[in-house]
Curated annotation (Swiss-Prot):
GO biological process assignments: Golgi to vacuole transport; intracellular protein transport; vesicle-mediated transport
UniProt-recorded name of the protein: AP-1 complex subunit gamma-like 2
Region (Disordered): 592-617
Provenance organism: Homo sapiens (Human)
Effect of residue 376 to G: Greatly diminishes interaction with ubiquitin
Region (Essential for ubiquitin-binding): 369-379
Length: 785
């Protein structure tokens, strides 16, 4: 007979009394040895006590796997004290990864069949916590019987167990569908809450269930209206709101049932208006109900006045002292800004005020919403606010703010001068945080505004003289001084105060940039080229410029050294050609939002005139290997002859006149996958400098109610093509249209072979693993021809 070891309370006191971690380990190891000995000797009297101590040790992070089989023995015992500890141990020590969890299936089945409510409750709790798919299939009939038991205690647990079963095995939806209609007539709030949760899960999993439960929308409306008009109840009211948990759950279900369904939406419109106007907002419980009401109004086909009411509620949330509520309001308004832009615009001053929040998450959300609210009518006022925020915002927000200002200015700039001033302000304030293409965009903008050349070069010269630490600003200034240095010296700009600059000051400033330790190699390249161009624009002697160029002929940076050697050679051997070579750069067409719209229109016009069908390949069997699927030889495909899209194209070629070809039209996007709210879209870009290269951006979005996790997208192409997969932007797609995942595919197709893609998607959705393998044969012809 094993001498009984410590009681659980004594063990806890001894562990807490340990002075060091070594003493704690010593106590636990000693007690675990006693527990092992007791298990080996099969002591039935103290088994539940030993397992309880082992569970406490497990909670402290120490190994307790040797107690798994003891859980099975205690569950099979007829004593309630043993079963209670046994089921608790099973929930803590067992899961689907251990085969031992299947051994308790028969014990759970027997306990569910008994009429003892506490035992049935223990079995249901365990099944809903760690029940695997196999266990759910075996025990579904027993749980279905318990759904209509007279005891509310058992029915509540059976309903929640059914929710777990549907998440594990969606095909069990048909088993639990019939009892739900009867359960909706219950007056017990706990049963109603569980039933609404079960119906919500059924509707998310099964389109048939969604159609079935749209018939009960009037009943749900009646239940919610009763809750709203009900007086104070000590049993259910929280902060003066009648059962806010049940109200929130009903609103979520109504949102699912009313989405894209006109009749259901009309049925619940009046109720939603009643909830939105009668709910008390002085406490957090009322705010929770109001927020869920707003989400429901946003998702269903609600009336226009109701949507304005929802936006106004979110506007009141912005004035709340609770930061969590303000964050929720900003996030929701950001979702609404595309569909209800004018209604959200009314709260623009409050949103801008949120930029000054000390909380980083709040100011980030306010920044995103402020940028989304910019349009052609308020761009000047919004840019002033955003530029003021840029000067004082935290460093982690400065890059996003600068990029957003540049994009908004490019899209809504009222004048070119205002556009240039805005970009210069961003470069001066946060030059090191701007996007890489900001320098190229500004140089193209200045080059295309001939009337602003003198103004731009003087503004940039002044900014460069004050600060040479902002590298993008220095690069643009050096480029502009090199191109338009003659205008800087002429002093004939009427738009700003007169500025007297001589040649020596300009050269000294560029030399300062070259010698600065803060200058990047690319910046020195800009400055060296600017000096070289000034040799044809200045009237003085070029010896100083030649000396600087010759110095960098021995620079350690290879690119800078090569450039200096070439410039020196230009001075020595080709001086007669130097003026022609260093002429001002011609105008460069800018790629922006307006150019994209024009290209889209020309693309649509071209599609109307082209009627050639795109050949498709039959879908291959999914049983073969992913790469071998695409190894088959593709048939010869005949394409219509390419027609010159330019007007009078044949005449131009006949006369041998110079002709600038139009920019290529954008390739249309393609949706290739959609399942339960998860969508996969492909967008295509073919760089003009490398037509054989195709860049495909995979965008995964999620409009369902559950997050998509562990998302992986793999692809394969025929062996005649080369595929390179870039790393995705993440592996989780948030629910309800959250931030999508993007991934870049680089495909090299030098032979212009017909393009086919084989995609394999794996992800977890609603606690279920999903794997899809499919072939994409309808890729646009423009992506490979």
């Amino acid at each position: 007979m094993v001498v009984p070891s410590l009681k659980l309370q004594d063990l806890i006191e001894e562990i807490r009394g340990a002075k060091t971690q070594a003493q704690e380990r010593e106590v636990i190891q000693k007690e675990c040895a006693h527990i092992r000995a007791s298990f080996r000797d099969g002591d039935p009297v103290h088994r539940h006590r030993q397992l309880a101590k082992l569970l406490y040790v497990h909670m402290l992070g120490y190994p307790a796997h040797f107690g798994q089989m003891e859980c099975l023995k205690l569950i099979a015992s007829s004593r309630f004290t043993d079963k209670r500890v046994g089921y608790l141990g099973a929930m803590l020590l067992l899961d689907e990864r251990h085969d031992a969890h299947l051994l308790i299936t028969n014990s759970i089945k027997n306990d569910l069949s008994q009429g003892i409510q506490p035992v049935q409750g223990l079995a249901l709790c365990t099944l809903s916590t760690m029940g695997s798919a196999e266990m759910c299939r075996d025990l579904a009939p027993e749980v279905e019987k318990l759904l209509l038991q007279p005891s509310p205690y058992v029915r509540k647990k059976a309903i929640l167990t059914a929710v777990h079963m549907i998440r594990k095995v969606p095909e069990l939806s048909s088993v639990f569908l019939p009892p739900c209609a009867q359960l909706l007539h219950e007056r017990h709030h706990g049963i109603l809450l569980g039933t609404i949760t079960l119906i919500t899960e059924l509707c998310e999993r099964s389109p048939a269930a969604l159609r079935h439960f749209r018939k009960v929308v009037p009943q749900l409306v009646h239940i919610l209206r009763t809750l709203v008009t009900m007086g104070y109840s000590t049993e259910h009211s929280i902060s003066g709101v009648s059962d806010p948990f049940l109200q929130v759950q009903i609103l979520r279900l109504l949102r699912i049932l009313g989405r894209n369904h006109e009749e259901s939406s009309e049925t619940m419109n009046d109720l939603l208006a009643q909830v939105a106007t009668n709910t008390d907002t002085s406490r957090n419980a009322g705010n929770a109900v109001l927020f869920e009401t707003v989400l429901t109004i946003m998702d269903i086909r609600s009336a226009a006045g109701l949507r304005v009411l929802a936006v106004n509620i979110l506007g009141r949330f912005l004035l709340n002292s609770d930061r969590n509520i303000r964050y929720v309001a900003l996030t929701s308004l950001l979702r609404l800004v595309q569909s209800d832009h004018s209604a959200v615009q009314r709260h623009r001053p409050t949103v801008v005020e949120c930029l000054r929040e000390t909380d980083a998450s709040l100011s980030r959300r306010a920044l995103e919403l402020s940028l989304a609210l910019v349009n052609s009518s308020n761009v000047r006022a919004m840019m002033q606010e955003l530029q003021a925020f840029l000067e004082s915002c935290p460093p982690d927000l400065r890059a996003d703010c600068a990029s957003g200002i540049l994009l908004a200015a490019e899209r809504f700039a009222p004048t070119k001068r205002w556009h240039i001033d805005t970009i210069l302000h961003v470069l001066t304030t946060a030059g090191t945080h701007v996007r890489d293409d900001a320098v190229a965009n500004l140089t193209q903008l200045i080059g295309g505004a001939q009337e602003l050349h003198a103004y731009s070069v003087r503004r940039l010269y002044n900014a460069l003289a004050e600060d040479i630490s902002q590298q993008p600003l220095v690069q643009v200034a050096a480029w502009c001084i090199g191109e338009y240095g003659d205008l800087l010296l002429a002093g004939n700009c009427e738009e700003i105060e007169p500025l007297q600059v001589d040649e020596e000051e300009v050269l000294a400033l560029l030399e300062k940039v070259l010698q600065s330790h803060m200058s990047l190699p690319a910046t020195r390249g800009y400055a060296l080229t600017a000096l070289m161009k000034l040799s044809t624009r200045l009237c003085g002697d070029n010896n100083r410029i030649r000396q600087v160029v010759s110095i960098y002929g021995s620079c350690l940076d290879v690119e800078l050294q090569q450039r200096a050697v070439e410039y020196d050679t230009l001075f020595r051997k080709y001086d007669h050609m130097r003026a022609a070579i260093l002429e001002k750069m011609p105008l460069v067409e800018r790629d922006g939002p307006q150019a994209d719209e024009e290209a889209k229109e020309s693309k649509e016009a071209a599609q109307l005139s082209e009627a050639a069908p795109v050949p498709t390949e039959p879908q291959a069997s999914q049983l073969l290997d992913l790469l071998d699927l695409l190894d088959g030889a593709s048939g010869d495909v005949q394409h219509p002859p390419h027609l010159d899209p330019s007007p009078g194209g044949a005449l131009v070629h006949l006369l041998d006149l110079p002709c600038v070809p139009p920019p290529p039209a954008p390739i249309p996007d393609l949706k290739v996958f959609e399942r339960e709210g998860v969508q996969l879209n492909l967008s295509f870009i073919r760089p003009p400098e490398n037509p054989a290269l195709l860049l495909i951006t995979i965008t995964a979005t999620n409009f369902s109610e559950g997050d998509v996790t562990h998302f992986i997208c793999q692809a394969a192409v025929p062996k005649s093509l080369q595929l390179q997969l870039q790393a995705p932007s993440g592996n989780t797609v948030p629910a309800r249209g959250g931030l999508p995942i993007t991934q870049l595919f680089r495909i090299l197709n030098p032979n212009k072979a017909p393009l086919r893609l084989k995609l394999r998607l794996t992800y977890d959705h609603f606690h279920q693993s999903v794997q899809e393998i499919f072939e994409v044969n309808n890729l646009p012809v423009e992506s490979w021809q």
